[in-house]
Amino acid sequence: YKSLDEALTHGGIANNVKVNLVRIESDKLKKNEISKKLKSVSGILIPGGFGKRGTEGKISAIKYAREKKIPFFGICFGMQMAIIEFARHKLNIKNASSTELDKKCYPVIGLIHEWNKNGKVFKGTEKNLGGTMRLGLYTAKLKNNSAIKKIYKSNEIKERHRHRYEVNTNQRSKFEKKGLIFSGMSPDNKLPEIIELKNHPWFIGVQFHPEFKSRPLAP
């Protein structure tokens, strides 16, 4: 997470604050300890990752951030965990998860071919990853009047990606009716790149890795 640590430092410099990192091991985070562990933090960041280890702790932390109005930022896997948390607790889809974690789940996250049989989406061609890796610089179009558009001050952005799994767009209308907005989409409107929560001080998830492009004078 060196690039992530440096990006947080860059952001602190830009805002004239010192960023004090509190590292929490999500696989050791128990539900009855959430408040004790997180009540003193100013924000919660769930970074990229993979695999089942620690996912329930991450989901519990996201729920706490959403309900307690604590600023939250989810990057790549972190955004996917936010989708799962919202699906379980706001859409009442109790077995919502990712097919990366549970093949028998209700797939709010999955490989595109697992939930979208129509249309063609370029996914990369790395042979050792089965041709499913979405890798490199991709464009996202930003929703008008969204928090993310105010942050970037642009109609579209280009950010670096490295992931295989995507948000299931078949449930987009249900998420948005409950207040979770898909505020950044791929140019063909098929792939969610950014989500944000209405009526929350700062709750944003991104499928890309903004830390890869962060620089001291351009965080």
Task: List each model region and its residues.
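N-terminal beta1-alpha1 cap of cysteine-dependent amidohydrolase-like domains
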Residues: 1-199, 207-219
